[in-house]
């Protein structure tokens, strides 16, 4: 029941927030103009994906507040902070633009800090820090690339979320189950928006 509550909240937030956010982005002129590297051919609104992060963060917060995640709560908190920071960086990139060097450097810093925090919390070897840092920075870039392909971001997020949720159930890791479920729910709700690419 608590898992359904958290996932449901993530779903509703990700589904409904774009209704209010898209008009704001239109007024601000946050647009993606197609070029030779683009995967789309029409002008689309940028930055709407931050509503997915809002849904995931709401779901994770509820997993802590309701007691769904009773142990390893610090892992959920670290994940939430990492998601919030990465989403903020992505929003700044969409809204103002960042140089490749600055963006890559900040992504790497996020990866280092996030992985180090997880390694310390989970009492793992610090050799995982460089691996995790590169993996996180690389994954953010892959996600950014997929963002312009019709529907692939939503489908990918659902698949990854379900995979982690199932892994959490099989491994009896409540934090992983909760994180996977709210991620899948948030991306599922955003899929109709992602399929439309939100043309102006």
Show which residues each predicted segment covers.
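"…together with the soluble PPM/PP2C metallo-phosphatase catalytic core" -> "…together
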Residues: 1-198
């Amino acid at each position: 029941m608590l898992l359904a509550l958290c996932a449901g909240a993530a779903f509703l937030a990700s589904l409904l927030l774009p209704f209010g956010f898209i008009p704001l982005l239109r007024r601000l002129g946050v647009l993606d103009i197609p070029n030779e590297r683009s995967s789309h051919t029409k002008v689309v609104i940028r930055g709407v994906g931050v509503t997915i992060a809002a849904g995931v963060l709401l779901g994770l917060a509820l997993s802590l507040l309701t007691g769904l995640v009773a142990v390893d709560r610090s892992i959920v908190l670290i994940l939430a902070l990492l998601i919030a920071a990465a989403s903020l960086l992505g929003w700044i990139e969409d809204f103002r633009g960042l140089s490749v060097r600055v963006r890559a450097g900040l992504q790497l810093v996020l990866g280092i800090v996030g992985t180090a925090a997880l390694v310390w919390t989970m009492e793992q070897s610090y050799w995982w820090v460089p691996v995790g840092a590169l993996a996180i920075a690389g994954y953010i870039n892959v996600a950014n690339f997929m963002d312009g392909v019709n529907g692939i971001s939503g489908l990918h997020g659902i698949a990854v979320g379900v995979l982690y949720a199932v892994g959490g159930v099989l491994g009896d890791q409540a934090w992983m189950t909760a994180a996977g479920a709210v991620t899948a729910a948030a991306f599922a709700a955003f899929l109709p928006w992602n399929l439309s690419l939100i043309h102006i």
